[in-house]
Amino acid sequence: MKNLRKIGSKDFPLIVSWYKGHKQAVPDPRALSNTGFIVDNRVAGWVLLTNSNIALIEGIISDPSSIPSLRRESLNKLVGFLIDFCLAAGYTQIIGITKHPRIDLLGKRYGFKTLPDHKILYLNAADDGDNEKD
């Protein structure tokens, strides 16, 4: 696909500026997979591949200063590519996590379903917080 490439270490400062522009927390680079892609220098996202048939699309972010119609076009290209990438690699289940309504709508257009009664649980062993076990 034209204007789509793997994310490299030189892209990280640009992507950090996007997270900051959206007033979102910047992810720890160690938490990002090496299967990240950037489209048109406007949007980026990652695929986390597992040792099962499940892949996770994660970390989709856009340049907040880009023209909205071009950003939407690039986002559509990215999501379509990430899904095709997962399917071509043999993954039959793809999970996406978002709180952004536009990403939610785009996912539904691609056939994703939501689980409205579920919560996302996570554990970050690097947190200094209380990991209380009941």
Regions inferred by a protein language model and the residue ranges of each:
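Short amphipathic alpha-helix that is part of the acyltransferase structural core
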Residues: M1-P27, H118, D128-D134
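A conserved beta-strand-loop-helix scaffold within acyl/acetyltransferase catalytic domains
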Residues: I15, Y19-I38, V43-S62
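Short glycine-aromatic motifs
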Residues: N34, G111-T114
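Short glycine/proline-enriched coil/turn segments at helix->beta-strand junctions
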Residues: D40-V43, G90, P116-H118
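Acyl-donor binding region in acyl/amide transferases
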Residues: A55-G111
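Conserved catalytic-core motifs of GNAT/GCN5-like acyltransferases
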Residues: K113-D127
